[in-house]
Swiss-Prot record:
GO terms for biological process: ERAD pathway; protein folding. This is Calreticulin. It holds the Pfam family Calreticulin. An alpha-D-glucoside binds at residues 115, 117, 134, 141, 324. A motif (Prevents secretion from ER) lies at residues 417-420. The gene is CRT.
Length: 420
């Protein structure tokens, strides 16, 4: 049947458009670091007096999918970095909150990361640093071989609460998109490159509130509770004469030397060897305990100190975004930041930025690696002796550093990293 055109059709179309507009997400902040970005961001003077403040470069990096798609990149080794931007203050109460950004570690990062922070209240952007109070932190965290995870912290009542779940992060030298979503039902999700890597409950995965249930402190294990899983086998008896078996016996193959003189050398005795019959102290075999009741556990009761917070997910004041980090090796590049209440909108933003260029960036990286390998191969034998000397020097330096670290009790790089 044909659809009749007219006023009813027009009204339906308008209602459909109105419905789409009603569910469209709100963007609180968006940054692609295009021309004019410096007017929106404030570089902190944190650590400047100590000559430890690093400079940011506006660049697309050594390899990229689009030379015109630039971000901000750390440029100096062993430096602190801090920069922030302000946006209209809002609260995520009764709404979803999405924080998303892209990051690329061109330097093949082995220790570091980068705190991307949401802050509220009054912040002096010129002094923003490691001690500045914040509401939310999300970052990929890499610490040598031990830590390679997405580091997420929520601050409530002045206390910083680290997520209790380990979510692996990307560790290569390409751009990756990290998304942190908090919902009004107190659930959250962590996405990497638009793929959900972890989801769960804020109640369960952060120790923001006391536990709802606790072990009953008054409960006692019953005296007749049998928690021995195995018991000695009453049927197993020690063989007669077992304790008389010697641990060692004279070597039956040993012969008295022909030139042995009993008067001068003393009475000859054969050397001993382990006795193959000796089995060590006798131990009674164990069997399953037929009366085993399991490990006793105190029953759980309601925690009298627990007080629910229906707005555990919410932050009353979100007004700034900051990037703050310490870098042993510089080269980390941040780009394409968005703060919104619509996960679908954030996903589209990622696809239109990172997604559009990821294949070209991978090709550029592969080409750069191939060129580097060819250049290294071209040097050939001329550098082999030098390389060997360098390796020996590096090994000696590592040994010296290990000795120094053993004395200090802590690696100096880790001290810098831990300072953050």
């Amino acid at each position: 049947m044909a659809i009749r055109k007219g006023s009813s059709y027009a009204v339906a179309a308008l209602l459909a458009l109105a419905s789409v507009a009603a569910v469209a997400g709100e963007v609180f902040f968006q940054e692609k670091f295009e021309d004019g970005w410096e007017s929106r961001w404030v570089k902190s003077e944190w650590k400047k007096d100590e000559n430890m403040a690093g400079e940011w470069n506006h660049t697309s990096g050594k390899w990229n999918g689009d030379a015109e798609d630039k971000g901000i990149q750390t440029s100096e080794d062993y430096r602190f970095y801090a920069i922030s931007a302000e946006y209209p203050e809002f609260s995520n109460k009764d709404k979803t909150l999405v924080l998303q950004f892209s990051v690329k570690h061109e330097q093949k990062l082995d220790c570091g990361g980068g705190y991307v922070k949401l802050l509220g209240g009054d912040v002096d952007q010129k002094t923003l640093g490691g001690d500045t109070s914040y509401s939310i932190i999300s970052r990929p965290d890499i610490s040598r071989y031990s830590t390679k995870k997405v580091h997420t912290i929520l601050t409530k009542d002045g206390k910083n609460h680290l997520i209790k779940k380990d979510v692996p992060c990307q560790t290569d030298q390409l751009t990756h998109v990290y998304t942190f979503i908090i919902r009004p039902d107190a659930t959250y999700s962590i996405l990497i490159d638009n793929e959900e890597k972890h989801t769960g409950s804020i109640y369960e995965h952060w120790d923001i509130l006391p536990p709802k249930k606790i072990k009953d402190p008054e409960a006692k294990k019953p005296e007749d509770w049998d928690d021995k899983e195995y018991i000695p086998d009453p049927e197993d008896k020690k063989p007669e004469g077992y304790d008389d078996i010697p641990k060692e016996i004279p070597d039956p193959d040993a012969k008295k030397p022909e030139d042995w003189d009993d008067e001068e050398d003393g009475e000859w005795t054969a050397p001993t060897i382990p006795n193959p019959e000796y089995k060590g102290p006798w131990k009674q075999k164990k069997i399953k305990n037929p009366n085993y009741q399991g490990k006793w556990k105190a029953p759980m009761i309601d925690n009298p100190d627990f007080k629910d917070d229906p707005y555990i997910y919410a932050f009353d004041s979100l007004k700034y975004i900051g990037i703050e980090l310490w870098q042993v090796k510089s080269g980390t590049l941040f780009d394409n930041i968005i703060i919104t209440d619509d996960p679908a909108l954030a996903k589209t933003f990622a696809e239109e930025t990172w997604g559009k260029h990821k294949e070209a960036e991978k090709a550029a990286f592969d080409e750069a690696e191939k060129k580097k390998e060819e250049e290294d191969a071209a040097k050939g034998g001329d550098d082999e002796d030098d390389d060997l000397e360098d390796e020996e020097d590096d090994e000696k330096a590592d040994e010296d550093k290990a000795d120094s670290d053993a004395e200090d009790g802590k690696d100096s790089d880790d001290e810098k990293h831990d300072e953050l």
